[in-house]
Amino acid sequence: MNQFGPSALINLSSFSSVKPEPASTPPQGSMANSTTVGKIAGTPGTGGRLSPENNQVLTKKKLQDLVREVDPNEQLDEDVEEMLLQIADDFIESVVTAACQLARHRKSSTLEVKDVQLHLERQWNMWIPGFGSEEIRPYKKACTTEAHKQRMALIRKTTKK
């Protein structure tokens, strides 16, 4: 389970690029299994980047612990650590931005787990462990049947003549 609980919420008013609708948000007691996370660290002037002294999701120490978990004898170069931290920050920023757009599309001023979950499932083919996807049905492209292929071949053949 993650540190935010099963259904974390983030108020979109803390993001400068997302302008929430003036709709009122429901009181916290009315939403089952929800907790408010609060504002995300980072200022609009820094491009939303988190400075090392703020609460980063992935720090150098956490990255080193992860590497030791995979191979206790492995040591990353400083440049590699910086690059991996940058990639992680960029990934998180892009996911949060897309999830905020989904929340705005729902006409909500609150970012919910289902927004992040939908983006990760559709764009990255990732599932968040511990979160059910009853509300989000799997998105699968329809496979083409043999009959359809034959019809399309016939259409192509007749249009070439």
Curated annotation (Swiss-Prot):
It comes from Mus musculus. CDD domains: HFD_TAF12. One of its GO terms (cellular component) is transcription factor TFTC complex. It comes from the Eukaryota. SUPFAM superfamilies: Histone-fold (SSF47113). GO terms for molecular function: DNA binding; DNA-binding transcription factor binding; protein heterodimerization activity; RNA polymerase II general transcription initiation factor activity; transcription coactivator activity. The modification Phosphothreonine is found at T43, T59. Residues 56-128 form the Histone-fold domain. The modification Phosphoserine is found at S51. Component of the TFIID basal transcription factor complex, composed of TATA-box-binding protein TBP, and a number of TBP-associated factors (TAFs), including TAF1, TAF2, TAF3, TAF4, TAF5, TAF6, TAF7, TAF8, TAF9, TAF10, TAF11, TAF12 and TAF13. Component of the TATA-binding protein-free TAF complex (TFTC), the PCAF histone acetylase complex and the STAGA transcription coactivator-HAT complex. Component of the PCAF complex, at least composed of TADA2L/ADA2, TADA3L/ADA3, TAF5L/PAF65-beta, SUPT3H, TAF6L, TAF9, TAF10, TAF12 and TRRAP. Residues 1-17, 26-37 have a biased composition (Polar residues). This is Transcription initiation factor TFIID subunit 12. The lineage of its organism: Eukaryota, Metazoa, Chordata, Craniata, Vertebrata. There is a cross-link at K19 (Glycyl lysine isopeptide (Lys-Gly) (interchain with G-Cter in SUMO2)). The TFIID basal transcription factor complex plays a major role in the initiation of RNA polymerase II (Pol II)-dependent transcription. TFIID recognizes and binds promoters with or without a TATA box via its subunit TBP, a TATA-box-binding protein, and promotes assembly of the pre-initiation complex (PIC). The TFIID complex consists of TBP and TBP-associated factors (TAFs), including TAF1, TAF2, TAF3, TAF4, TAF5, TAF6, TAF7, TAF8, TAF9, TAF10, TAF11, TAF12 and TAF13. Keywords: Isopeptide bond, Nucleus, Phosphoprotein, Transcription, Transcription regulation, Ubl conjugation. Residues 1-56 are annotated as: Disordered. Belongs to the TAF12 family. One of its GO terms (biological process) is regulation of DNA repair. It is found in: Nucleus.
